[in-house]
Design a protein with these regions (language model features):
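Conserved beta-strand
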Residues: 9-12, 19-33, 61, 353-371
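ABC ATPase nucleotide-binding domain signature region
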Residues: 31-35, 46-110, 367-450, 529-532, ...
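Conserved switch/coupling elements of ABC/ABC-like ATPase nucleotide-binding domains
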Residues: 63, 211, 224-239, 532, ...
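ABC-family P-loop ATPase nucleotide-binding domains
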Residues: 78-153, 424-494, 500
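GG-anchored amphipathic helix commonly corresponding to the ABC/SMC/Rad50 NBD signature/C-loop
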Residues: 156-176, 388-389, 477-497
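Hydrophobic anchor residue at the start of the ABC signature
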Residues: 164, 192, 483, 502, ...
C-alpha cells in the first residue's frame, strides 16, 4: 500500500472570527493512496479539506502538500449562473483558445493555453461523454454546446458528476472531494466509484457512502481534535474500533471497580480514625494515663491519622483520575429511542395517489414504506413537491397527468390527508434566527416547553443545544432538528415525505435517522439514491420513475 505522505498536517489550528475553533492542534498525514475521511457532523471535515486546498489559512500550525491540489466542495450547485465549463474548471483555457481562433493573438492568451490546452474543449466533451453525463445535451459548435450550459439547468446529480468529471480531467496530484455522492443516482454513483477505484494520485474523500468507503486504502477519522488514521477500508476500521472500544470499556469497568474499592478503604480508614479518636477522648476522661503520656499519644495519633487520611484521599484521587482517563477512551454510543405520538393510520387509510404517464395509479394506504427511485433529472423531487403542495386533499382527487411549462409530460401526485410532514433536499424552511426549541415549537405550539425539551433530548438534542440559534448548526444538526420538528408535530403527520434525507449526514447521523424512523407508525415515502439506507428502513414497496414519467413497481 502507498505510504508516501502527500499531505502533512502539523499542529494545525483554525478559528473563525467569532472564536469557534473546529480544528484545534491536529497533526497527521494523508498518503498517496485513497483515503476516506470520516467523522461526526460538525467536527471540521469540510474545514480541514479547505485548509489543505488553500481555501482557508491556518490560524496556527501548518499544512504541507506535495504537488498540486484539486478541491470539490460539498455544494457545487449553488452558482446557477456558472457554466458546465466553469464546473469542469476549464473555462479560462477554452475562452483563450476561442479568442485566438477569432484572431486575438495577445501573448497572455497563449500563456493561458500553454502546451496542453489546445484540444481541451474536445477532451472535456469527450470526458463528459465517457462519464455518461449530459448525454442529451448538444455538443456542437463553440458557444452553443454542452460546455456552455448553465449549472442552473442541471439536476443536482448532474452538476456533481460534472464537477467530479472535471477532477478527473484536470488530474491534480492531490484530489479533495467533499461528500461527492450527494444527489447522485445509482448509475452516477457507479461512475464516481470507478473514479475512486482507478485514482492514481492522492485522494481524500469525505463521505457517508459506505460502498465508496470500501474502495479506499486508508480511513482517517477526525474526532475531538485529533486525526486517527487506519490502514484499511471503513468496514475494517469499524471492526478495529469495535475491538478497541471493548478493551476501553473493560478498562473503564476495572477503573470504576478500583475507585469503588478505594472509596470503601477511605471510609474504613476514616471510621478507624474516628474510633481511635473516641477511645483517646475516653481514656483522657477516665484519667487512665498520666497527662504527659496522653499528650504524647495524642500527638502521635494525630500525625498517624493525618498521614492515613492523606494516603487514602490520594489513592481515591488517583482512582478517580484513572476513571476519567478511561472514560475519555470510551465513545458515546448515542441511540435515538423515542415514543412518538400515534398518527392513527390504519391499514385501509388512503394517504396519497400517484399516477404515471401511462395512466397507472398507485395508492399509498396504511403505514406503508415506499421508495421512489430513478435516474437524476426524471422529476422525483418535482413529484414530491406536487404531492405535498397540491391543493386541498379529497378522497377521489388526483392531479392530472400533463405537460408542464417546459412541455415535458410528467407523472402526478395528490395527497389525501392534510397531515403531511415533508423534509426537502434543501432545508431552506428553517428559521436561522430562531433557537432550536422555538423552531421545533412551530410544529407543536401546544406542547409545553418542558415536555418539548424532554422530547428533544430523546432525539439527542440536549442541554445548551436546545437554545442555540439554528444558524449555528452544522448540516447534519440542521437535518436532525428538522426531522425532530416533523416527527414531534402536533397532531402527528400521517404521511412522512423525505427527499434524499441522508445527504450531508455523517454515518452516525444516518444510523440515528434509521433508528428514529423505526419508531414512526405512519406512512413513509422517500426519495434516495442511498441503497444501503433504503435497505435498512423496512420498505414495503419501491416505485421507479422513468424518463417518460411512467411509474413502475420494482420487484423486491
Amino acid at each position: 500500500m502507498p505510504s508516501t505522505p502527500a499531505v502533512v498536517l502539523h499542529d494545525l489550528t483554525f478559528s473563525w472570527p467569532d472564536g469557534a475553533t473546529p480544528i484545534a492542534g491536529v497533526s497527521g498525514a494523508f498518503t498517496a493512496g485513497r483515503t476516506g475521511l470520516v467523522g461526526l457532523n460538525g467536527t471540521g471535515k469540510s474545514t480541514l479539506l479547505r485548509l489543505v486546498a488553500g481555501r482557508l489559512a491556518p490560524t496556527t500550525g501548518a499544512v504541507a502538500v506535495t504537488g498540486t491540489t484539486d478541491y470539490l466542495p460539498q455544494r457545487v450547485t449553488l452558482d446557477t449562473d456558472a457554466t458546465v465549463a466553469d464546473l469542469l474548471g476549464v473555462r479560462r483555457v477554452i475562452d483563450a483558445v476561442r479568442a485566438i481562433a477569432d484572431g486575438d493573438f495577445r501573448p497572455e492568451l497563449f500563456d493561458v493555453v500553454g502546451a496542453d490546452g489546445w484540444d481541451l474543449e474536445e477532451r472535456a466533451v469527450a470526458a463528459l461523454a465517457a462519464a455518461d453525463v449530459l448525454a442529451g445535451s448538444p455538443a456542437g459548435s463553440p458557444g452553443g454546446g454542452v460546455l456552455d450550459r448553465r449549472v442552473g439547468t442541471l439536476s443536482g446529480g448532474e452538476a456533481v458528476l460534472t464537477a467530479v468529471t472535471g477532477v478527473r480531467l484536470r488530474g491534480a496530484d492531490v484530489a479533495l472531494l467533499d461528500e461527492p455522492t450527494n444527489n447522485l443516482d445509482g448509475a452516477a454513483r457507479e461512475r464516481l466509484h470507478e473514479l475512486v477505484r482507478t485514482w492514481r494520485g492522492a485522494l481524500v474523500v469525505v463521505s457517508h457512502d459506505r460502498e465508496l468507503l470500501e474502495l479506499v486504502d486508508s480511513t482517517a477519522e477526525l474526532r475531538t481534535g485529533s486525526l486517527t488514521t487506519f490502514g484499511g477500508t471503513y468496514g475494517q476500521y469499524e471492526e478495529w474500533v469495535a475491538v478497541q472500544q471493548e478493551a476501553a470499556r473493560s478498562a473503564l469497568r476495572d477503573a470504576e471497580q478500583t475507585l469503588r474499592r478505594e472509596k470503601r478503604q477511605r471510609i474504613e480508614t476514616q471510621e478507624r480514625i474516628a474510633h481511635s479518636e473516641r477511645q483517646g477522648r475516653k481514656d483522657a476522661a477516665d484519667r487512665k494515663y498520666v497527662e504527659a503520656v496522653i499528650n504524647d499519644r495524642r500527638n502521635a495519633a494525630q500525625k498517624s491519622q493525618g498521614s492515613r487520611r492523606g494516603a487514602a484521599a490520594d489513592a481515591e484521587a488517583r482512582a478517580r483520575a484513572a476513571v476519567a482517563t478511561a472514560g475519555r477512551a470510551v465513545r458515546d454510543d448515542d441511540r435515538i429511542v423515542v415514543d412518538l405520538p400515534d398518527p392513527d393510520v390504519p391499514a385501509g387509510r388512503r394517504l396519497a395517489v400517484l399516477r404515471g404517464t401511462d395512466g397507472r395509479e398507485t395508492v399509498l394506504a396504511g403505514p406503508v414504506r415506499v421508495a421512489l427511485t430513478g435516474p437524476n433529472g426524471v422529476g422525483k423531487t418535482t413529484l414530491l413537491e406536487q404531492l405535498v403542495g397540491a391543493g386541498a386533499p379529497g378522497p377521489d382527487v388526483v392531479g392530472s397527468v400533463g405537460a408542464g411549462s417546459d412541455g415535458v409530460t410528467r407523472a402526478s401526485a395528490q395527497r389525501l390527508t392534510d397531515r403531511v410532514g415533508y423534509l426537502p433536499q434543501r432545508l431552506d424552511g428553517l428559521d436561522d434566527a430562531a433557537t432550536v426549541l422555538d423552531e421545533v415549537r412551530r410544529g407543536a405550539p401546544h406542547v409545553p416547553p418542558g415536555e418539548l425539551r424532554n422530547r428533544l433530548a430523546r432525539f439527542l438534542v440536549r442541554g445548551d443545544q436546545v437554545d442555540r440559534p439554528v444558524r449555528t448548526l452544522s448540516g447534519g444538526e440542521r437535518f436532525r432538528v428538522a426531522l425532530t420538528g416533523v416527527l414531534l408535530a402536533d397532531p402527528p403527520a400521517q404521511l412522512l415525505v423525505l427527499d434524499e434525507p441522508t445527504n450531508n449526514l455523517d454515518l452516525a447521523s444516518t444510523d440515528q435517522l434509521v433508528q428514529a424512523l423505526s419508531f414512526y407508525r405512519g406512512g413513509l415515502m422517500v426519495v434516495s439514491h442511498d441503497r444501503g439506507f433504503l435497505d435498512r428502513i423496512g420498505l414495503t414497496a419501491e416505485l421507479a420513475l422513468g424518463t417518460g414519467g411512467a411509474l413502475t413497481e420494482v420487484a423486491r
